């Protein structure tokens, strides 16, 4: 009997704890950020949940900066390249490692880039590969981000996601060498050696 009571209590906790998880709206999130309470805390908003971001390792930091600089030079006058800054989506405000967005950059003085401003996003992954390929990919596809690249540092490859169908990317291609073009700028060839840093 005691065991059944304990089981009942645990089941009650499970059901009720699940039901009271708070979902933050974008407006509430902005108020929280503006209040200063999150100052210095490595967190982002994903699907209404405040999620802790992984510390940035040396290889990740170097790759992120190198790739951003390369793309900034390559797309000068064509697109604005942002690194490690927020984007505003529906119920999410993640901080992708690199976002290639529309010009002019001055339009982001009053708001972060929206989905319609984004050409494509890049995540540099080492310890965050599971999160980038299982969690963030859902958010990006559901919000209509047309193209999502993941630089897999551990396996030295680029994983490109395109063609959204039913809130997911239906086309996934892996690259290890050569050149590639974003579907937004088919005339500009990107050297994979510059992304994977061979």
Feature annotation, model-predicted:
Residues 1-198:
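Gly/Pro/Ser/Thr-rich low-complexity, intrinsically disordered segments predominantly at protein N-termini
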